[in-house]
Amino acid sequence: MKNDTLKGQYRINEQIRAKEVRIVGDEIEPKVYPIFQALKMAEEKELDLVEISPNAQPPVCRIIDYSKFLYQLKKRQKEQKAKQVKVNVKEIRFGPQTDDHDYNFKLKHARGFLEDGDKVKAYVFFKGRSILFKEQGEVLLLRFANDLEDFAKVDQMPVLEGKRMTIQLSPKKRKCLKNRRLPNR
């Protein structure tokens, strides 16, 4: 299916409508040729005349094996896609009354996520009347951000969204982060 979209992208051989074309390539002197001469040259070499740049005046063409050209394009696109950095957002949930042991456990996991290059979204979930303790939730999230300041920078300060108060952290550039230790509280 993707190959079909690449096929329709370039005009080849008789599909080229211009009267003259500029041919570029390895074994051909780059200059302007009439279309019939360019097609004849491609036919003699048992290759295709492919219109690379249709908007140029005159259009730029190459004499190449079209299927090989499509294969190389597809391969290049696949390599570019593999080089893209995929950012994951990991969520960590707290309650407004989170105990120190639970806090340290979640802090340790957040540190691991940040070292792996993932973003961390920490939130305090308020159930029922616990929304009255939103100041405690904000203090907890600010403490969380402060404890991770060596590993992360704050993208978004604590914000109350419905029954959740969230903070978003993204990893700092890596420079010997693995040797640092978490503060004990």
From Swiss-Prot:
<dbReference type="InterPro" id="IPR019814">
    <property type="entry name" value="Translation_initiation_fac_3_N"/>
</dbReference>
<dbReference type="InterPro" id="IPR036787">
    <property type="entry name" value="T_IF-3_N_sf"/>
</dbReference>
<comment type="subunit">
    <text>Monomer.</text>
</comment>
<keyword id="KW-0963">Cytoplasm</keyword>
<protein>
    <recommendedName>
        <fullName>Translation initiation factor IF-3</fullName>
    </recommendedName>
</protein>
<keyword id="KW-0648">Protein biosynthesis</keyword>
<dbReference type="GO" id="GO:0032790">
    <property type="term" value="P:ribosome disassembly"/>
</dbReference>
<dbReference type="Pfam" id="PF00707">
    <property type="entry name" value="IF3_C"/>
</dbReference>
<dbReference type="InterPro" id="IPR019815">
    <property type="entry name" value="Translation_initiation_fac_3_C"/>
</dbReference>
<dbReference type="GO" id="GO:0043022">
    <property type="term" value="F:ribosome binding"/>
</dbReference>
<dbReference type="GO" id="GO:0003743">
    <property type="term" value="F:translation initiation factor activity"/>
</dbReference>
<dbReference type="GO" id="GO:0005829">
    <property type="term" value="C:cytosol"/>
</dbReference>
<dbReference type="InterPro" id="IPR001288">
    <property type="entry name" value="Translation_initiation_fac_3"/>
</dbReference>
<dbReference type="Pfam" id="PF05198">
    <property type="entry name" value="IF3_N"/>
</dbReference>
<keyword id="KW-0396">Initiation factor</keyword>
<dbReference type="InterPro" id="IPR019813">
    <property type="entry name" value="Translation_initiation_fac3_CS"/>
</dbReference>
<dbReference type="InterPro" id="IPR036788">
    <property type="entry name" value="T_IF-3_C_sf"/>
</dbReference>
<comment type="similarity">
    <text>Belongs to the IF-3 family.</text>
</comment>
<comment type="function">
    <text>IF-3 binds to the 30S ribosomal subunit and shifts the equilibrium between 70S ribosomes and their 50S and 30S subunits in favor of the free subunits, thus enhancing the availability of 30S subunits on which protein synthesis initiation begins.</text>
</comment>
